């Protein structure tokens, strides 16, 4: 398992491709080791889930509105049944403000459509400091391939 000890090949592929599709063992551990190696190499890392992402570009880079969840049948009364919109800061705003390269590790990437995955790939190509790792499923051993190749398959 020399890969898990150094992470050099993973980092080299991430720098070259900018976005990787990862298939990690379901028991976990591999992603935290790689995140630790990337942080030691000077990257800022963000870990998030792909569930509930909505518009990826607005969620990651722009100021966007979020409504509170609807909790079922409510009497309207004086208050509206729909909560008021709250503005939420972009998730990657503070990380991209610094000069360091940023790695966004997205868990449960298999729930994203191919169009959403393509928009994440385009976002990485547009923003030079942003690198993305998208977990697309489980595997018996850690393996990865470029996200562009995963989209083509």
Swiss-Prot record:
- Its EC number is 7.1.1.-
Sorted alphabetically, which keywords does the UniProt record give?
Membrane, NAD, NADP, Plastoquinone, Quinone, Thylakoid, Translocase, Transport
Q: Which GO terms describe its cellular component?
A: plasma membrane-derived thylakoid membrane
GO MF term set: oxidoreductase activity, acting on NAD(P)H, quinone or similar compound as acceptor; quinone binding
InterPro entries in alphabetical order: NAD(P)H-quinone_OxRdtase_su_N
Superkingdom: Bacteria
Is-annotated flag, keyword Heme?
A: no
Q: How does it sit in the membrane?
A: Peripheral membrane protein
Tell where it localizes: Cellular thylakoid membrane
User: Known catalysed reaction(s)?
Assistant: a plastoquinone + NADH + (n+1) H(+)(in) = a plastoquinol + NAD(+) + n H(+)(out); a plastoquinone + NADPH + (n+1) H(+)(in) = a plastoquinol + NADP(+) + n H(+)(out)
Keyword Metal-binding in the entry? The reply is no
Q: Which family does it belong to?
A: Belongs to the complex I NdhN subunit family.
Function, as annotated: NDH-1 shuttles electrons from an unknown electron donor, via FMN and iron-sulfur (Fe-S) centers, to quinones in the respiratory and/or the photosynthetic chain. The immediate electron acceptor for the enzyme in this species is believed to be plastoquinone. Couples the redox reaction to proton translocation, and thus conserves the redox energy in a proton gradient. Cyanobacterial NDH-1 also plays a role in inorganic carbon-concentration.
Q: How does it assemble?
A: NDH-1 can be composed of about 15 different subunits; different subcomplexes with different compositions have been identified which probably have different functions.
This protein is called what?
Answer: NAD(P)H-quinone oxidoreductase subunit N
Per the UniProt record, the lineage of the source organism begins with: Bacteria, Bacillati, Cyanobacteriota, Cyanophyceae, Synechococcales
């Amino acid at each position: 398992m020399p890969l898990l000890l150094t992470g050099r090949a993973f980092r080299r592929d991430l720098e070259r491709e900018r976005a990787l599709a990862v298939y990690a063992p379901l028991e976990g551990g591999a992603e935290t080791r790689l995140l630790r190696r990337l942080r030691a190499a000077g990257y800022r890392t963000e870990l998030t889930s792909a569930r509930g992402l909505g518009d990826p570009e607005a969620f990651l880079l722009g100021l966007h509105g979020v409504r509170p969840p609807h909790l079922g049948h409510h009497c309207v009364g004086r208050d509206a049944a729909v909560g008021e919109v709250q503005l939420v800061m972009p998730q990657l705003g503070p990380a991209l403000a610094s000069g360091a390269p940023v790695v966004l590790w997205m868990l449960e990437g298999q729930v994203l459509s191919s169009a959403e995955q393509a928009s994440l790939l385009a976002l990485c190509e547009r923003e030079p400091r942003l690198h993305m790792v998208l977990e697309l499923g489980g595997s018996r051993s850690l393996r990865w391939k470029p996200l562009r190749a995963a989209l083509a398959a």
